[in-house]
Amino acid sequence: MTHITGTLYIISAPSGAGKTSLVKALMDAQQEPQHGAQAKIRVSVSHTTRAMRPGEVNGVNYNFVDRAEFVRMIEHGDFLEQAEVFGNLYGTSQSHLQQTLDEGHDLILEIDWQGARQVRAQMPQARSIFILPPTQQALRQRLTNRGQDSDEIIEARMREAVSEMSHYNEYEYVVVNDDFAGALEDLKAIFRANRLTQQHQQEQYSELFQELLA
C-alpha cells in the first residue's frame, strides 16, 4: 500500500487579519459530506507562555506552559521553531509535527514570519500562505471591535502588524481577506491545487500509473 506523507502549510498574518477565523472555517468545511476521505487537515497546537483567554481550552487552542517549562523544552531541543511576541513565548513541537505528517495528514502551522523562516530553513518543502487585510483602517477597526485591548496595546499591535506585513513577499501565496467568503475559497483553492501536483498524485496513484504505463 502506498504511503502518503502529509503537507505542511505555514499560515501567517498580522493580528486582526482574520487568520484564526479563516482556518476555523476551513476546518469546519472539511467536515462536510462531499469532502469524504479527502478530509485530512489538522491544525498544529503550539506551546505558549501567555495567559489563557476566556473560552480557550488547554491542549486545543494552545498547550499552556510557564516560562520555566518553555525554556526547559528549548534546552531539550523540543521545538522546530520558537518566537517571542508581545513578551510571550510561542513554540512548535517537532515530534508532534513530524508524527502528524507521517500519518498522512496535512498540517497547518499558524506562526509569524520569524517562525516561518525557521521552519522553511529546516523544511523547504513546506507551503507558505500570508493573509492580508484589505486596508490598515480595516485592520485597526477589527482590533478595536474585539474589545480586548486598550488603545495603547492596539497601537502597539498596529506597529507590529505593519512590521509583520512587510514580510508578505517571503510567502508563496497571498490571500487578501476583504470578503470573508471569497478569502475562504481562495484558501481552499490552495489546498486543492497542492493535492493535484504531480508529486502528490504520484504518491496517491502510483499503482494506477504503473498499470497505465505497463
UniProtKB/Swiss-Prot annotation:
Gene3D superfamilies, per database record: Guanylate Kinase phosphate binding domain, P-loop containing nucleotide triphosphate hydrolases
Molecular function via GO: ATP binding; guanylate kinase activity
Residue ranges of domain Guanylate kinase-like in the record: 6-192
Record bears the keyword Cytoplasm: yes
Chemical reaction(s) catalysed: GMP + ATP = GDP + ADP
Signal peptide residues on this chain, from the entry's feature table: none
SUPFAM superfamilies: P-loop containing nucleoside triphosphate hydrolases
Places the protein is found: Cytoplasm
Source organism superkingdom: Bacteria
Amino-acid positions noted as binding ATP in the UniProt annotation, renumbered to this chain: 13-20
Main subcellular localisation: cytoplasm
GO cellular component, one term: cytosol
EC numbers for this chain: 2.7.4.8
Keyword entries, A-Z: ATP-binding, Cytoplasm, Kinase, Nucleotide-binding, Transferase
Pfam families: Guanylate_kin
Record bears the keyword DNA damage: no
Summary of the function given for this chain in its UniProt record: Essential for recycling GMP and indirectly, cGMP.
Family: Belongs to the guanylate kinase family.
Protein's recorded name: Guanylate kinase
Organism this protein belongs to: Pseudomonas savastanoi pv. phaseolicola (strain 1448A / Race 6) (Pseudomonas syringae pv. phaseolicola (strain 1448A / Race 6))
Gene: gmk
